[in-house]
Amino acid sequence: MEDELLNFNYTDSGLPVIIKVIGVGGGGGNAVKNMYHGKVRDVSFLLCNTDVQALDRSEVPDRLVLGREVTNGLGAGSRPEVARRAAEASEADIRKILDDGHTRMVFVTAGMGGGTGTGAAPVIGRIARELNILTVGIVTIPFVFEGKRKILQALEGVEEMRKNVDALLVVNNERLRIIYKDLKLDNAFAKADETLTNAANGIAEMIMKEGTINLDFADVHTTLKDGGIAIISTGYGEGPDRMEQAINEALTSPLLNNNDIFKARRVLFNIYQGTEDPLGTDELSAINELTAKIETGFDTIWGYTTDPELGKKVKITILASGFDLDTTRESIRIGDNLGNVINDPISSREIETQNERDNDLINRYYRPDELEKVKVVDFKPIILNLDELDNDELIMALEEKPAYSRTGVLLSRIDNIRMRIAESAGRLKKDVVRSEESERPAFESERSSSPTTISFN
């Protein structure tokens, strides 16, 4: 498989494509596949992965193997640090792909919580940003049932993404599970891909669709450049009060991750009307109310476009950035749902501090009521003693899967191995004691029969 990207495509109008969507890892690759076969137009696509087989299975033509010499093309094994090294090893290739003279905006999309997406996406974001390309991250974070360990790994990846992109949109899979309660598991992941697609498409069409009051790349650049945490939300309306319906739907979407649009530093919105029933002047009052609320010293840009596919409906897409991180946190702590104390050699204060940091990070993106509905397993570290460290069978069992994905069967096998090691070590120590006692002089054996004895049981 070729590791190089072909020349960028051109739009139907003959202009070079300035927007590139990069899918990183398995989750990002699935999202880009969905976009490639879906409605996202006038953009080009690139897949990046440490897993050669995953790339070979994709129909997206432009693909890059990350760090072949680091992973041998076999994937990162759910280890972000391996994926980070792989992406850094391919930095020259990534720069060559992006520094083509055309690309002015890059979407880096990934699922946070695994290996390649979590570790490599921030590296790709950094490279794009260093090339002065407007860089937007669009990532998912796990369902609660995937466990605390994966959630924390995902949110650490989110924090790294925040440092390395201009703006970051976070899609909470758990929020999707609550909104679409009757979805099967496969459909739930597909819904996450669809949400990523809609986010990228919403921004792309603001740039590419010509409007009566036109938005362009410069407007999106102004809104997202160094914007930090961002959101995009779309609402539809039909019939009486359709404009109010659309605005209300956009402003109250659960996918806003609890962010209040009116607390954003920058807001851009675009209004779309159909050709069958264009907006009347009397409907502008709802728009006036919206702009009155957000025009309080913040940068606000808006546009107005006709979309024949809407028929009699109207649509509004709101893009906002520059949220203070404090506004993304919940006022109620998670507490023992995720913060149980673990027994290990670390001091209790260090454990408490780490739990506080972990809970604070989780509180930025998950609501307490979401976490209460699904029991979250608190994965405790396995502290090995010297006998266990010398046991190859135990080490191989521990290396089969990361802690958050070990099933009851594997955990039982690990426990059984540790019990055998302990029993064997106990027998060995007893044999040593008996041997030493048999070699002692009689008077020393008598002296050892005093009540003060040492037990190896």
Swiss-Prot record:
It holds the Pfam family Tubulin. It is found in: Cytoplasm. Residues 448-457 have a biased composition (Polar residues). GO terms for cellular component: cell division site; cytoplasm. Residues 429-447 have a biased composition (Basic and acidic residues). Residues 429-457 are annotated as: Disordered. SUPFAM superfamilies: Tubulin C-terminal domain-like, Tubulin nucleotide-binding domain-like. Transmembrane segments: none annotated. GO terms for biological process: division septum assembly; FtsZ-dependent cytokinesis; protein polymerization. One of its GO terms (molecular function) is GTPase activity. Keywords: Cell cycle, Cell division, Cytoplasm, GTP-binding, Nucleotide-binding, Septation. The keyword Cell cycle applies. SMART domains: Tubulin, Tubulin_C. Homodimer. Polymerizes to form a dynamic ring structure in a strictly GTP-dependent manner. Interacts directly with several other division proteins. Belongs to the FtsZ family. HAMAP family: FtsZ (MF_00909). Essential cell division protein that forms a contractile ring structure (Z ring) at the future cell division site. The regulation of the ring assembly controls the timing and the location of cell division. One of the functions of the FtsZ ring is to recruit other cell division proteins to the septum to produce a new cell wall between the dividing cells. Binds GTP and shows GTPase activity. This is Cell division protein FtsZ.
